Amino acid sequence: HCFSYDNNKYITFLAKTNGTFNIGDDVVNSYMMFNNFHTGRDKSSILTTNISVWCSNTFLNAMKDNSQFKIGITHRVEYSSELDSLIKHKLETALRSNEEYKEQATTLDNKQIVENDLLKYFILVYNPKLLPSYEKEGAGYKALNSVEGSNLTQIKRCYGVWHDTIESNGKSFKLQNTGNNVRNDTYWKAFNCVTYNEDHLRGGSDNVSSRLKNNFFTNGKDNIKTKAMDTALELAVA
C-alpha cells in the first residue's frame, strides 16, 4: 500500500508482514512502514505499525521507544553494508515488538469494563485533571456536561464510538466500520475507541492529510495512542 498526502510532501509505504494475530474475531495485521519526505528537512524513517482489519485502526508499537525501533535516514547518506545491517537489526527488533503488542491486546481483551469505568478510562487518557470534577458530579455521561476542561470533545467522541454513534451540530449519526461487532465489552474495545477517534474523527473528515500524519508519524496527536495503551494496561491488571 502507498499513501501520498500534504501535496505529495509525505509518502508512506506499507508492506504486510507475517505478524497477523486474532483477538477472537478481531484481526490485526502487522506492517513494515517506510516514510519518505519531500520537505527538504525531514529524515526518511522505517518502523512498524499494526492495523485492524475491521476498522483500519492503527497503532505504532514502535513509537513507544524511538531510539530502539525507529531509523532516520537523510537523503545525503550513502546506503552502505553497515547501514544495511543496522536496518535489518532494527527491523527484526521492531517485528518482535509485535508479539508484545499481541500479548497486550490479549490482556486488555480479558478484562471486562462497565460504563462508568469506560468514561473514567477516556478521561485518564485525554485529561486526567478532569477526574475529580467528574466523580464529584456523580460520574456517568451526564456528569461530563458539568465538567470544564480541555479535550472533552475527544472524551465524548470516544464514548460515542463505543456506541457506534457521533454527534454533530446537535444531531446523532451512525458510525460505520468501528469494529465493535467483533469485540466484547473489554478494555481492548475501549482502547480501540481511542484509536478509531484518532484515526478517523479527530481533525475532521475533510482534513485527510492531517489525520494521515497523525496516524503514521505521531501515533495520534501527542502520541495519545501510546498513552491509551499504557493506561488501559494499568487498569486491566489493577
What label would you give each PLM region?
Residues 12-13, 32:
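A broad, low-specificity signal marking well-ordered, structured residues that form hydrophobic/aromatic
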Residues 18-238:
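Intrinsically disordered, low-complexity regions enriched in serine/threonine
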Residues 1-12, 18-20:
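N-terminal "first-domain core" detector
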